[in-house]
């Protein structure tokens, strides 16, 4: 089992050390990332980080103790102006050819997971029920501006409340399924390139990363 994290620095600052990454301050961001890494190492021993070269420099300077750092291409340079911040994680998933557990850098796993967890075909943090309709409203907005949703989503979208897999933790033993899932997500992005560039809706990340994972599993 591989234990993975992904961090892609979108920082446009001269010094990416000051990247807040959604936190109140850079200090909170990097401290949380370090604690997340240390907790995974405490439980499972070996943790690999997938990151772009900008992020790698900071991680090495701060001595965050990843056992392996895999430098990924600056894939987001081709998506300037888009809101596809989950795409680097999708890239990490697509590169895996053996069972893995991916944990977000702001997820703190204080306790090791039970043995029964590792027997599952697929892993996710939890199932979320979209009772606030964030995903549905995002999809409705997307369709209204010309976006195309894959056919495999049709049945679930007829339900009053749709379900998504929280990707704070994601992975599994069924790597073949995960490869198929990432292919479908990439195809969605490719087929809707023009719409995604014009429609700056960050909730679309939940659709192609979390909703598709859940839909493809339940429809399989």
Task: Please tell me what each predicted stretch does.
Residues 9-13, 54-57, 76-77, 107-109, ...:
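Short, solvent-exposed loop/turn segments at secondary-structure junctions
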Residues 42-46, 65-66, 95-100, 118-120:
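Short glycine/proline-enriched coil/turn segments at helix->beta-strand junctions
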Residues 112-142:
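Conserved donor-nucleotide/metal-binding helix-loop-beta segment in metal-dependent transferases, i.e.
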Residues 149-190:
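A conserved mid-domain beta-alpha-beta active-site/ligand-binding segment of alpha/beta enzyme cores
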Residues 209-213:
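Short active-site alpha-helical segment characteristic of glycosyltransferases
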Residues 217-220:
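Conserved small/polar residues in nucleotide/adenosyl-binding loops
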């Amino acid at each position: 089992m591989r234990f993975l994290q992904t961090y892609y620095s979108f920082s446009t600052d001269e010094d990416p050390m000051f990247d807040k990454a959604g936190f109140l301050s850079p200090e909170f961001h990097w401290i949380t990332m370090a604690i997340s890494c240390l907790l995974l190492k405490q439980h499972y021993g070996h943790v690999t980080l997938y990151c772009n070269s900008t992020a790698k420099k900071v991680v090495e300077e701060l001595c965050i103790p990843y056992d392996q750092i895999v430098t990924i291409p600056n894939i987001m340079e081709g998506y300037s102006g888009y809101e596809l911040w989950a795409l680097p994680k999708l890239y990490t998933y697509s590169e895996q050819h053996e069972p893995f557990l991916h944990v977000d850098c702001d997820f703190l796993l204080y306790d090791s997971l039970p043995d029964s967890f590792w027997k599952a075909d697929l892993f996710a943090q939890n199932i979320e029920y979209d009772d606030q309709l964030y995903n549905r409203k995002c999809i409705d907005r997307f369709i209204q501006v010309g976006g195309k949703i894959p056919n495999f989503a049709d049945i679930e979208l007829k339900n009053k409340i749709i379900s998504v897999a929280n990707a704070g933790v994601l992975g599994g033993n069924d790597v073949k399924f995960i490869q198929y899932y990432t292919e479908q997500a990439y195809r969605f992005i490719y087929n809707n390139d023009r719409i995604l560039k014009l429609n700056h809706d960050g909730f679309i990340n939940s659709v192609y990363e979390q909703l598709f994972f859940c839909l493809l599993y339940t429809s399989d």
